Amino acid sequence: MKGIAGRQTRGLPLGANITCADNTGARSISLIDVKAWHGKARRIPAAGVGDMFMASVKKGTPEMRSKVVYAVVIRQKRPYRRPDGTMVQFEDNAAVLVTPDGEVRGSEIKGPVAREAAERWPRIAAIASIIV
């Protein structure tokens, strides 16, 4: 995992429902904790593109449902600015399930992956079909 330079627009607060964009068996997950969150007192933690977080599986196969898993955000609906000045926004909020060390649990990713997530997580970039 590499660091991200500059400030990041975090568009997914606690409790956000996120589409799972891989083939692990989870379809919908709910954000319950953001890893490495250092925020202000009483501020609700939020995750942005490339952040690792803990989630609860809400919809999916019976084996996956109600499990607590780690995931990385690969798309977010809230617009964010890149260093070259362009604004990026996706159609949905999506994440892929990973192990605590950052290894991807699935073998394929559906839909595009944000460049910020691909640069930070090389294992995600390796199996991504489209990087935007």
From Swiss-Prot:
HAMAP family (alphabetical): Ribosomal_uL14 (MF_01367)
UniProt cross-references to PROSITE patterns, sorted A to Z: RIBOSOMAL_L14
Task: Provide the function of this protein.
Answer: Binds to 23S rRNA. Forms part of two intersubunit bridges in the 70S ribosome.
What family does the entry list?
Answer: Belongs to the universal ribosomal protein uL14 family.
Q: Which Gene3D superfamilies would you find in this protein's record?
A: Ribosomal protein L14
Gene Ontology annotations of biological process type: translation
- The superkingdom of the source organism is Archaea
One Pfam family assigned to this protein is: Ribosomal_L14
Provide a Gene Ontology MF annotation, just one.
structural constituent of ribosome
Protein name as catalogued: Large ribosomal subunit protein uL14
Q: How does it assemble?
A: Part of the 50S ribosomal subunit. Forms a cluster with proteins L3 and L24e, part of which may contact the 16S rRNA in 2 intersubunit bridges.
Q: Name one GO cellular component term.
A: cytosolic large ribosomal subunit
* Assigned keywords, A-Z: Ribonucleoprotein, Ribosomal protein, RNA-binding, rRNA-binding
Q: Gene name on record?
A: rpl14
